[in-house]
Regions:
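Short hydrophobic beta-strand element within catalytic cores of glycosyltransferases
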Residues: 294-297
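Short N-terminal targeting/anchoring amphipathic segment
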Residues: 71-90, 94, 104-107
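Short alpha-helical donor nucleotide-sugar binding micro-motif in glycosyltransferases
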Residues: 254-255, 262-267
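A short, active-site helix/loop in glycosyltransferases that binds the activated sugar's phosphate group
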Residues: 133-177
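Nucleotide-activated donor-binding/catalytic signature segment of Leloir-type glycosyltransferases, i.e.
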Residues: 237-255
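Conserved donor-binding/catalytic core segment of Leloir-type glycosyltransferases
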Residues: 186-214, 225
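Conserved acidic donor-binding segment of nucleotide-sugar-dependent glycosyltransferases
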Residues: 308-310, 314-322, 330-336
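Nucleotide-sugar donor phosphate/pyrophosphate-binding loop at the beta->alpha transition
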Residues: 105-107, 114-135, 151
Length: 368
């Protein structure tokens, strides 16, 4: 089967949506012919994947939204469409295409709600929001990382009325690429790690709360590594400076795949302090757990289902620096608890999120 995968962002832009698109394409390519369509972005390098990626110049774009009118003609060559939602501007093109091509299969992956839009983004996304339910009605299936997230999302009502249309497929992680050090030498300095975008599109990651929590830690032998880049980095650097801990917070910038794997292995604790439902899952949690690192994440729908609170890590109240401080302290001042959670995290990553297990679930959806 020839499948057109459509996604609003794709590497080198960092983010979970693009990462999952690569994973899905690789999985589906074992049984199908897959082409990924995504908007042109500045400085996109040539890569091994590029022969399976078509970057289209949008007629209009704003943020991650883009109007790819060319798709309407290009989709004629494909038997099926895999649309990563949200994709304002292009989701409407898919909806319109399906009206005239009812036999073309459509599977949608619902990644996340979109909150905190600017006024212009709200105006530009209005057609997509208006046609959303019509588009979902056209879909053969709607996949998602967590049904818990869907049940508490902006499409909860649609899910309640069409539960059989939805299929939960958690994201996966390469447990050979992300794995613990064989002979780790413990350091007196406890390393806390955050990985994620530092741009306005990822405002919801809660880095400001993480910095505030770190400044209140009751012990001094810690270091915070922040891996990622974006237009908010200067703001976070200034916050760290204002809190008097510029020397204890390292902004590592955007790391390549090998550097990222190494930085996970060197961490004592991983933190994902997201503040709202723009965070739907957290692939970075899988990468950390596979690396044998205990995790702390916000008690948000979807995110809270990635691991078991008290086993592989701890959940926190969203946007609560004090609770985050207490949970960091609890793990990093108890070596036995840290070790126990690290081992459990690695075990869960292998048993539930290994690529082999997750890939089979995705292939089953397309077979059926």
């Amino acid at each position: 089967m020839k499948i057109a995968q459509i996604v609003c962002v794709y590497p080198p832009y960092a983010g979970g949506i693009g990462t999952s698109a690569i994973q899905f394409a690789k999985t589906l390519s074992t049984d199908h012919e897959v082409m990924t369509f995504t908007p042109v972005i500045k400085d996109a390098p040539a890569s091994a994947e590029d022969k399976h990626v078509t970057r289209l110049k949008p007629l209009l774009s704003h943020g991650h939204g883009a109007l790819l009118l060319q798709l309407f003609c290009r989709l004629n060559k494909y038997d099926a469409i895999y649309l990563h939602y949200p994709f304002f501007g292009t989701a409407e093109i898919v909806w319109l295409y399906k009206i005239f091509h009812k036999k073309t299969r459509l599977i949608i992956h619902y990644h996340m709600d979109v909150r905190g839009l600017s006024l212009i983004a709200k105006i530009l996304s209005w057609p997509s929001r208006l046609t959303k339910n019509c588009l979902f009605n056209q879909a053969d299936k709607i996949t998602c990382g967590s049904l818990d997230y869907i049940a508490n999302s902006q499409i909860a009502k649609y899910y309640k009325n069409h539960p059989n249309k939805f299929v939960e497929i958690p994201f996966g992680v390469d447990t050979e690429k992300f794995k613990p050090l064989d002979n780790r030498i413990e350091s007196k300095i406890k390393t806390i790690l955050f990985v994620g975008g530092l741009d306005q599109a990822h405002y919801f990651k809660g880095i400001d709360y993480l910095l505030e929590a770190a400044s209140q830690l009751p012990f001094s032998n810690w270091q915070l590594n922040i891996a990622g880049a974006g237009n908010l980095q200067k703001q976070y650097e200034e916050q760290a400076k204002d809190l008097g801990m510029a020397d204890k917070v390292k902004f590592l910038g955007k790391l390549n795949a090998n550097e990222l794997a190494e930085i996970y292995r060197s961490a004592d604790l991983f933190v994902l302090p997201s503040i709202n439902s723009n965070e739907a899952f957290g692939i970075v949690l899988l990468e950390a757990m596979a690396s044998g690192v205990p995790v702390i994440a916000s008690n948000l729908p979807g995110v809270r289902t990635v691991f078991q609170n008290g086993i592989e890590g701890l959940t926190i109240k969203p946007a609560n620096a004090n609770d985050l401080k207490e949970k960091i302290t609890k793990i990093l001042t108890d070596p036995e608890l840290q070790k126990k959670m690290a081992q459990a995290a690695r075990r869960l990553a292998i048993e539930k999120y290994s690529l082999a297990k997750v890939d089979n679930q995705l292939l089953d959806v397309w077979k059926n």
